Amino acid sequence: MPAEVGRWLRTVLAEVQLATSAVAAGDVARFDEALLRARRVYVAGQGRSGLVARAFAQRLMHIGFESYAVGDIISPAVGAADVFIAVTASGRTETTVSQAANAKAAGATIVTLTEMESGDLVDLSELRLLVPTRPPRGPESEQHATTLFCQTVQILFDVVCAMLQQQLHQTDAELSARHSNLE
């Protein structure tokens, strides 16, 4: 059993390394720039993609951004100068596509993280981060369904947060002061 654990750790880490290295660094830099210009940031996704998106919204809040997970009852109206981030491996998740269309109609900048090079959601987006986690652009994963996609997006979000924290000169103490103290 311990050998099996080691094999899976090596497999998962190798897959994530291949997938993250295939993401265009220029697109990540443009994503970072869009966030720096944003008045507010909204994240959307369903299932595990939604959980990864919500974790990103929380970390953005720690850094000092006004950020919301779409669907939470405290989310204000989206509008111009806002950034709407859609996370969906398929790029076709109906709820997320509909939310992005509504945000676009309200004047928000749409950023999509997806495995797909084209589709309705990509067409709505000012910026698409292609997250290649399936052949032919990405690795053949031994993990179930969109597991590699979610892992890769989480790593990309963590990288962007590290960049933003540095660019905004936010210390760990400042982030910790914004962390929930109700736990």
Write out the residue ranges for each language-model feature.
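Alpha-helical scaffold segments in soluble metabolic enzymes
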Residues: 11, 15-18, 30, 102, ...
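Generic secondary-structure signature for well-ordered alpha-helical cores
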Residues: 18-25, 65, 133, 161-170
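A short, charged, Gly/Pro-tolerant segment at domain boundaries
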Residues: 1, 165-183
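A short, well-structured juxtamembrane/interface segment
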Residues: 19-37
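Residue-level signal for pocket-adjacent positions within structured domains
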Residues: 18, 73, 143, 170, ...
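Generic N-terminal amphipathic, Lys/Arg-enriched alpha-helix
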Residues: 1-21
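Hydrophobic packing residues in well-ordered alpha-helices of helical domains and bundles
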Residues: 5, 9, 28-31, 53
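Glycine-rich phosphate-binding loops that contact phosphosugars or nucleotide phosphates
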Residues: 40-155, 161-162
